[in-house]
């Protein structure tokens, strides 16, 4: 499936997903391109974030390097050079829930509103596919301005 979407401030995104991409086993990549550069992260190299500034040299940012944000260090559970995987990502959410229950909120938890937006996006993708790929509004009515 190919999903095109618009976010706030005119940002355009594209999501491609397939369960039958020949030669890829659980491949999951995220790429972000903007006016000043681009980032790429791939599940096959989970400890690296590739950053390329416009007009500059590509840089590989490794897990555990000095200068990373506190959340990047806090959410890393295993030693450098060892991938963490999906189960530990979910465990981080559980830890954030426990912190929230103790009153140590970081505003990192998903909200009911973000869940509703996610469900609306899936429903819009299905409706668009049934309509031959027509552009479909994915914003729930209560969030429309």
Located regions from the model:
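Short glycine/proline-enriched turns and hinge-like loops at secondary-structure junctions
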Residues: 25-27, 43-44
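C-terminal capping/lid region of NAD(P)-dependent oxidoreductase domains
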Residues: 127-145
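Hydrophobic, well-ordered secondary-structure elements that form the walls
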Residues: 97, 115, 132
